[in-house]
């Protein structure tokens, strides 16, 4: 697929950056903001939507309730009754509020006079109460990008959701350790015009947040949501982009998806089709008997569980289900996503992809005959329990009919390959209502004074300071954008100048990336481990060269750090000199025959023996001494 002209199709992108704050307490109670795997009890809940003050039910909440899932909550030792929704929330945390105020000021946003907490209905189980508490801190503002001002719409404080442990068709298990951790949400205006600009703006906002020195790091602590639309399409919400580098691909693919859905709408009009024609000719036939001897593993597996096989006729839709919307995803995939989300069924096949999946040409012809499929028609085969098939057929018809309208209003989930899938309908205005258990909090002089310590430095000033520490411009830029910037500054204060800032920065960024490139599990390389190794270098317990070797072994084996370190005890000069003399003696004939390469030969062999136990500069010095 050729890339679209984004100015021509009217691409608009807005960002929602969600970042956990590194505070002592949660947003509405005094519990700590640390995560714990252990738990001492668990709760079980079922959640259901309720009518708003205007008598409306939010469509997204209704969608989640229809799944009928049970929610199980593990209660860790660092949790209280607030997280369990058995005690009213406490007043808003001052530290979190002060950080949000500081960020607001840095983004030229206008602070509200009083902070009012609202309830946002969420009944996917991620909140025990059935809603998420959120509060607007400031309005308006901007961030610069290549001379253009990207508007800020709102900056809000909200509580993070419970941490999902497992998800099955009937229940979801959550841990309450994450529920209530303060989260700052920065929403930009839809001023972003290209996929690459979106990545730059997200990077700059993330950088600004890190420069406060009060945000959490690691997987799941920051999340980018995207709002994407093109001319003729609709604003689509894309949730849960974890990696910045995925942002351009996700936007490109969403723009393409909306563009292709609009093309499908045009194609259906060219075919003189309309909703009434498709609806009136829509046919459902039970094909279970016809597939009783099939070789399709998917269908046979369902038949063994007493499932049924339905065939659906869709008039005039030949070629539509196979229409590619983005890489590896077609219109048929979109329909299947709706069925999976609403009916919990995964076995859907359409005529544009058959014969395939063990379904033979003869079986396809049999289905065409039974459903009375004409040359321009299409059909779908769906398998599952009868009670779910009834929901699935209604879902399929609804999604097919929406093709005549173009792009549906959806919330979609970001996938690791840069594509997206249907998640749920977009929530409506019936989702929000006031929190009656928390009094308003005025942004007074005390909060403004507290916020001063968190106002982030300008990136240009911070970059200059990093270069003044001796870092190259490239390494300084890498460190400026690093999630470990605050750790770097802490280690420099403790261990430089004996351990150079350049070595510390290289270890935190370049060495860790090297370990990852070698297949290492870098999740085991914690801040504590990195500091411990820098401290060992400072105390001359290991050499600088040993750090990379130790981290690589730690990330590629199950060996404990203290066991690995034992193998890298530094050699003293006498021991090192002995090894060098022995190596020269062992390779005497070779270096006599290759005098011009003698140094390289001995250097290679010595380093193989002493790697990680001796400083390479010292090795070079002693080899030169003994080679003459």
Swiss-Prot record:
Keywords from the named record: ATP-binding, Ligase, Nucleotide-binding, Protein biosynthesis
UniProt cross-references to Pfam families, sorted A to Z: GAD, GatB_N, GatB_Yqey
Coiled coil: none
Superkingdom to which the source organism belongs: Archaea
GO cellular component: cytoplasm
A GO biological process held by the record: translation
GO molecular function annotations of the record: aminoacyl-tRNA ligase activity; ATP binding; glutaminyl-tRNA synthase (glutamine-hydrolyzing) activity
InterPro entries documented for this protein: Asn/Gln-tRNA_amidoTrfase_suB/E, Asn/Gln-tRNA_Trfase_suB/E_cat, Asn/Gln_amidotransferase, Asn/Gln_tRNA_amidoTrase-B-like, GAD-like_sf, GAD_dom, GatB_C_1, GatB_Yqey_C_2
Reaction catalysis annotation: L-glutamyl-tRNA(Gln) + L-glutamine + ATP + H2O = L-glutaminyl-tRNA(Gln) + L-glutamate + ADP + phosphate + H(+)
Keyword Protein biosynthesis carried by entry: yes
Keyword Ligase: yes
Group of enzyme by EC: ligase
Enzyme Commission number(s) from the entry: 6.3.5.-
HAMAP family: GatE (MF_00588)
Subunit: Heterodimer of GatD and GatE.
Family: Belongs to the GatB/GatE family. GatE subfamily.
PANTHER family registered for this protein in UniProt: GLUTAMYL-TRNA GLN AMIDOTRANSFERASE SUBUNIT B MITOCHONDRIAL AND PROKARYOTIC PET112-RELATED, GLUTAMYL-TRNA(GLN) AMIDOTRANSFERASE SUBUNIT E
Function, as annotated: Allows the formation of correctly charged Gln-tRNA(Gln) through the transamidation of misacylated Glu-tRNA(Gln) in organisms which lack glutaminyl-tRNA synthetase. The reaction takes place in the presence of glutamine and ATP through an activated gamma-phospho-Glu-tRNA(Gln). The GatDE system is specific for glutamate and does not act on aspartate.
The name this protein goes by in its record: Glutamyl-tRNA(Gln) amidotransferase subunit E
């Amino acid at each position: 697929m050729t890339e679209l002209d984004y100015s021509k199709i009217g691409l608009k992108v807005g960002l929602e950056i969600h970042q956990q704050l590194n505070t002592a307490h949660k947003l509405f109670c005094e519990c700590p903001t640390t995560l714990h795997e252990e738990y001492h009890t668990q709760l079980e809940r079922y959640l259901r939507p309720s009518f708003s003050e205007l008598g409306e039910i939010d469509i997204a909440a209704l969608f989640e309730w229809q799944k009928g899932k049970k929610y199980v909550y593990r209660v860790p030792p660092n949790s209280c009754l607030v997280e369990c929704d058995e005690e009213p929330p406490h007043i808003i945390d001052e530290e979190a509020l002060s950080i949000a105020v500081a960020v607001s000021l840095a983004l030229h946003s206008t602070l509200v006079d009083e902070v009012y907490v609202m309830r946002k209905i969420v009944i996917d189980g991620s909140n025990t109460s059935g809603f998420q508490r959120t509060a607007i801190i400031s309005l308006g503002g901007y961030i610069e990008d290549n001379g253009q001002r990207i508007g800020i719409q709102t900056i809000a404080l909200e509580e993070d959701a419970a941490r999902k442990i497992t998800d099955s068709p009937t229940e979801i298990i959550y841990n309450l350790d994450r529920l209530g951790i303060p989260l700052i949400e920065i929403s930009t205006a839809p001023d972003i015009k290209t996929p690459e600009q979106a990545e730059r703006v997200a990077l700059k906002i993330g950088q600004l947040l890190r420069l406060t020195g009060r945000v959490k790091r690691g997987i799941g602590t920051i999340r980018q949501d995207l709002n994407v639309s093109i001319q003729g399409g609709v604003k689509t919400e894309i949730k849960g982009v974890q990696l910045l580098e995925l942002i351009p691909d996700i936007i490109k693919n969403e723009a393409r998806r909306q563009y292709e859905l609009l093309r499908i709408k045009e194609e259906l009009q060219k075919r003189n089709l309309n909703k009434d024609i498709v609806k009136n000719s829509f046919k459902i036939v039970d094909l279970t008997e016809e597939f009783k001897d099939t070789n399709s593993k998917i269908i046979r597996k369902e038949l063994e569980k007493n499932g049924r096989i339905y065939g659906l006729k869709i008039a005039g839709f030949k070629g539509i289900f196979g229409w590619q919307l983005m890489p590896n995803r077609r219109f048929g995939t979109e329909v299947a996503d709706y069925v999976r989300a609403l009916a919990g069924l995964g076995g859907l096949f359409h005529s544009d992809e058959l014969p395939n999946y063990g379904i033979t040409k003869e079986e396809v012809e049999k289905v065409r005959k039974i459903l009375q499929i004409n040359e321009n028609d299409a059909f779908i085969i769906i398998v599952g329990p009868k009670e779910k098939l009834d929901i699935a057929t209604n879902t399929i018809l609804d999604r097919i009919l929406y093709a005549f309208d173009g792009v549906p209003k959806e919330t979609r989930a970001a996938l690791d390959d840069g594509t997206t899938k249907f998640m749920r309908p977009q929530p409506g205005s019936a989702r929000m209502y006031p929190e009656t258990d928390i009094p308003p909090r005025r942004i007074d002089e005390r909060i403004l004074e507290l916020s001063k310590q968190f106002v982030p430095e300008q990136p240009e000033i911070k970059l200059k300071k990093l270069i003044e520490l001796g870092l190259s411009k490239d390494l300084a830029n890498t460190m400026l954008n690093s999630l470990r910037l605050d750790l770097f500054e802490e280690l420099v204060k403790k261990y430089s100048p004996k351990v150079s800032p350049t070595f510390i920065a290289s270890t935190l960024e370049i060495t860790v990336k090297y370990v990852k490139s070698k297949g290492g599990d870098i999740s085991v390389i914690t801040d504590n481990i990195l500091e411990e190794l820098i401290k060992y270098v400072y105390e001359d317990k290991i050499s600088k060269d040993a750090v990379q070797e130790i981290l690589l072994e730690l990330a590629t084996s199950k060996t404990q750090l203290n066991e690995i370190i034992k193998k890298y005890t530094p050699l003293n000069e006498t021991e090192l000199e002995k090894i060098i003399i022995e190596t020269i003696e062992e390779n005497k004939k070779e270096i006599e025959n290759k005098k011009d390469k003698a140094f390289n030969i001995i250097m290679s062999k010595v380093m193989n023996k002493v790697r990680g136990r001796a400083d390479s500069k010292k090795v070079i010095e002693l080899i030169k001494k003994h080679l003459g």
